[in-house]
Swiss-Prot record:
Its EC number is 2.3.1.191. One of its GO terms (biological process) is lipid A biosynthetic process. The active site is at H266 (proton acceptor). Keywords: Acyltransferase, Lipid A biosynthesis, Lipid biosynthesis, Lipid metabolism, Repeat, Transferase. SUPFAM superfamilies: Trimeric LpxA-like enzymes. PROSITE patterns: HEXAPEP_TRANSFERASES. Pathway: Bacterial outer membrane biogenesis; LPS lipid A biosynthesis. It catalyses: a UDP-3-O-[(3R)-3-hydroxyacyl]-alpha-D-glucosamine + a (3R)-hydroxyacyl-[ACP] = a UDP-2-N,3-O-bis[(3R)-3-hydroxyacyl]-alpha-D-glucosamine + holo-[ACP] + H(+). GO terms for molecular function: N-acyltransferase activity. This is UDP-3-O-acylglucosamine N-acyltransferase. It comes from Bordetella parapertussis (strain 12822 / ATCC BAA-587 / NCTC 13253). Homotrimer.
């Protein structure tokens, strides 16, 4: 169900926009003559929004829904607003903005804050807190949390039920850890981070050395002595794991966004404002630049260097360095099974076909 404010808390559209972080987005209102600005209780899609909700159009493929939406107001680009004016379309209050998706995001943030108050600060009686741990008076520690020796919880930080904060770990100001997040010892999370349930930061990296003294083919464990450092304004999805470094720390830069079920191995470094979709695996000691995007289920081999501003399509296997910004794709497209088998058989013979072609060219 969408978030709806109680009727008595509904806000006039202009008041709502002025109360969000929308001021820097250069928006203006376009309303039918003599129209009263609507009072807004929530936000929804064009197809589902009611007459007390605001909606948005950021993808042109949904433009036909403007004619049928029940939304009280719609966020659109200047081009869409001008086209509707030229067509004589009327009836909707428009919020005209060059970046409708971003304005929608700001409004969604406002509605989330309005509908989900943080609750009182303090430590739940069932939490277990080591005497040497430091918890800011404005922080909130939920039921069944465990805070180990020397850990520090910053101002305004919120820990959901069942979180574990290992020895010497830190959680920065205004960060939110959802229920059952685990930070092993020596993990440092910056300010305003959001970490979703089941995420584990600081487990041992996959480090083993062949050790014949233990038996034929046996492996000896390499203790992982580094930690994990997460920057400010980072979001980490549910059940994502970030391993501690072998000697140096594993680094997640400021503004990085990690989806659910991502594996970040030891000594990986992820540059600022990189976004990585679900089920990506990043092997050890790979460095990813700033402002990169990595599609879901991609796999990155270890000890690679990925440049800034690289976009990797979903499902791509990256096995060598990427030194130049741009888009990279390594996905073999799906097809009907019989067709795929025929194409795969040809691919296995490419070297032979190449030799035959060169022989023909020499004749």
């Amino acid at each position: 169900m969408p978030v709806l404010l109680d009727p008595e808390n509904a806000l006039a559209l202009d008041v709502l926009l002025a109360g969000t972080d929308a001021q820097g987005l250069d928006w203006h209102l376009s309303a039918p003559d003599a129209a009263d600005l609507p009072r807004i209780r929530g936000i929804g899609t064009l197809s589902s929004a009611g007459n007390e909700e605001i909606s948005f159009l950021s993808n042109p493929r949904y433009q036909n829904q403007l004619a049928t939406t029940r939304a009280a107001a719609v966020i659109v680009t200047p081009d869409v607003a001008q086209a509707r004016q030229e067509q004589g379309a009327s009836g909707h209050v428009l919020v005209v903005c060059k970046h409708p998706y971003l304005l929608y995001a700001r409004l969604a943030q406002w509605f989330e804050r309005a509908s989900r108050p943080a609750g009182p600060a303090g430590v739940h009686p069932s939490a277990v807190v080591d005497p040497s741990a430091e918890i800011d008076a404005d922080a909130r520690v939920g039921a069944q949390c465990v805070i180990e020796a020397g850990a520090r919880i910053g101002r305004g930080a919120r820990l959901g039920p069942g979180c574990v904060i290992g020895a010497g770990s830190t959680v920065g100001a205004d960060s939110l850890l959802h229920p059952r997040v685990t930070l092993y010892a020596g993990v440092h999370v910056g300010e305003r981070a959001i970490i979703h349930s089941g995420a584990v930061l600081g487990a041992d990296g996959f480090g083993f050395a062949p050790d014949p003294t233990l038996g034929r083919g046996a492996w000896g464990k390499i203790p992982q002595l580094g930690g994990v450092r997460v920057g400010n304004d980072v979001e980490i999805g549910a059940n994502t794991t970030i391993d501690r470094g072998a000697l140096d720390d594993t680094i997640v830069g400021d503004g990085v966004k990690l989806d659910n079920q991502i594996m970040v191995a030891h000594n990986v470094r992820i540059g600022a404002h990189t976004a990585i979709a679900a089920c990506v695996g990043i092997a050890g000691s790979t460095t990813i630049g700033e402002r990169c995007t990595i599609g879901g289920a991609s796999m990155l081999s270890g000890h690679l260097a990925i440049a800034d501003d690289v976009n990797i399509s979903g499902g791509t296997a990256v096995t060598s360095n990427i030194a130049k910004a741009g888009r990279y794709t390594g996905v073999y497209p799906y097809a009907e099974h019989s067709e795929w088998q025929r194409n795969a058989a040809v691919i296995q013979q490419l070297a032979l076909l190449r030799r035959r072609l060169r022989a023909l060219e020499r004749e």
